[in-house]
Every structure is written in structure tokens, then in C-alpha cells.
Amino acid sequence: MTKKPIVVGVTGGSGSGKTSVTKAICNHFSGHSILMIAQDVYYHDQANISFEDRLKVNYDHPLAFDTDLLISHIAALRRYESIEKPIYDYAKYTRKKEVEIQEPREVIILEGILILEDKRLRDLMDIKVYVDTDDDIRFIRRLLRDMKERGRTMDSVIEQYLSVVKPMHNEFIEPTKKFADIIIPEGGENHVAIDLMTTKIESILQKHV
């Protein structure tokens, strides 16, 4: 195979609309082979600590992720090598013993809140996208999602947001905006910005031979 894969990084705060942007890219390039890698399956394996201790971990901090493994996997995919991607158990806050074999694709989309925090990972990306959404909107989306999909109470979501999510966003996520090639305000609803982004991806795909 002569073409090199193109790696697109999509980041932004929790509830910013990263998933909507990622879906828009996938829909646009449905004729190409696409692989989506979520950063949050690369949380550290915590099988060696108790469930109670796992609950105390700050999952919005860069140290919560096994970034070295993620970097090695993205580098392997760029060389057209398969990887053994972790499978994360969100109910138990640790990895499953099983892994998922992933083959390289033409377009690799890496999505996550802290994918631009490490320069080694940034250097593996062809396009870096930051989805920039108002803090209040992001909070409301997270509140509704966690109450509906994860059975959380309103008080617990608010407490976590104020004590962990918001401070970590301001300290680690928001500052990575300066590394983005493209900033998309208001996420998946910004069709003009998404069209510009997909045009850029098409241009790079044509050159990657």
C-alpha cells in the first residue's frame, strides 16, 4: 500500500460537540476507509487497585491516560501496522482483559479531551481540530447526558463539574486550543467550518501518495 494514512485529531471540552464533528467527518468520507480512536479507552489499566480507589482518580487529568501506549498505537497505524486497542470497562473504571484488533485505514480520527496536550501525539496528526463551545452549553449537555445515560443525580454531576471538570478544563484542555489548525465554534452545528475542514482533509488525502 503506497498511500499514507491521514490522522485527524478532534478535541475540545466535555460536551463541546466532539462526537458530532467526528460523525460529520465519518459521514463525509463514507467512501473511504475510516477508523475512529477514542482517547478515553486509553485510560490506565487499574486492575491492581480497589474499586473505591478507582473512584478517587481524576479522569480529566493528563496522568489518567496511558499516553505512551496511545502514541505507539497511532505511530503503528501510520506505518500501516495493526494494533491491539484496549477495551475499557466504564462501569468498573479499568480495562477489560480482551483487546480489539484494529487494522489501519485511510483516515484515522483521534478524539478526546487531551489529545493535544502531549507534543509527541500532536506531531503524529495531520490536522488538529478544537471544538470550541460555550461553558454553559457544555455543562448543560454533560448534566443531561450523565443523568440520562449514567444514572447520576443532579447534585453529583454539579459537584463533579465544579470540583474537577471545570478546573481541569481551564488548566489543561482550554490551553491546547493554541495548537489547533482549525477551531470550530459551536461543534457539529457549524456546517461552514465542517465543510472547510473536510475540504482540507480531502486535499491532504490527494497528496498522501
From Swiss-Prot:
HAMAP family: Uridine_kinase
A Pfam family of this chain: PRK
GO biological process, one term: UMP salvage
Catalytic activity: uridine + ATP = UMP + ADP + H(+); cytidine + ATP = CMP + ADP + H(+)
Native organism taxonomy: Bacteria, Bacillati, Bacillota, Bacilli, Bacillales
Protein's name according to its UniProt entry: Uridine kinase
Keyword Transport: no
Matches recorded under InterPro entries: P-loop_NTPase, PRK/URK, Uridine_kinase, Uridine_kinase-like
Enzyme kind, highest EC tier: transferase
EC number(s) from the headed UniProt entry: 2.7.1.48
A molecular function GO annotation: cytidine kinase activity
NCBIfam families per record: PRK05480.1 (NF004018), udk (TIGR00235)
Stored Gene3D superfamilies: P-loop containing nucleotide triphosphate hydrolases (3.40.50.300)
PANTHER family: URIDINE KINASE
Record localization: Cytoplasm
Pathway: Pyrimidine metabolism; CTP biosynthesis via salvage pathway; CTP from cytidine: step 1/3; Pyrimidine metabolism; UMP biosynthesis via salvage pathway; UMP from uridine: step 1/1
Record keywords, A-Z: ATP-binding, Cytoplasm, Kinase, Nucleotide-binding, Transferase
Annotated residues for binding of ATP: G12, G13, S14, G15, S16, G17, K18, T19
Record-stated family: Belongs to the uridine kinase family.
Cellular component terms per the entry's GO annotation: cytoplasm
